[in-house]
Amino acid sequence: MAKIKIQQVRSRIRCPKDQKRTLDALGLRKLNQIVEHEATPSILGMVNKVRHLVLIVE
């Protein structure tokens, strides 16, 4: 599988709990933090759920 890098670019303040939990599941806890994951359907679904808070870094 391909690897993707995900960066949190917007704050989690005022986000619903499910979106905060999704960020936690992705390993994103701070602004501008970058994590690397395999591009599995479950990870891509999580990224899609919080797409307004994160950026895919190539």
Curated annotation (Swiss-Prot):
Name of this chain's protein: Large ribosomal subunit protein uL30
Subunit structure: Part of the 50S ribosomal subunit.
Family: Belongs to the universal ribosomal protein uL30 family.
PROSITE patterns: RIBOSOMAL_L30
Record Pfam families: Ribosomal_L30
GO annotations of cellular component type: cytosolic large ribosomal subunit
GO BP: translation
Keyword annotations from UniProtKB, A to Z: Ribonucleoprotein, Ribosomal protein
GO molecular function list: structural constituent of ribosome
InterPro entries reported for this sequence: Ribo_uL30_ferredoxin-like_sf, Ribosomal_uL30_bac-type, Ribosomal_uL30_CS, Ribosomal_uL30_ferredoxin-like
Gene name, Swiss-Prot/TrEMBL: rpmD
SUPFAM superfamilies found in the cross-reference section: Ribosomal protein L30p/L7e
Domain of life: Bacteria
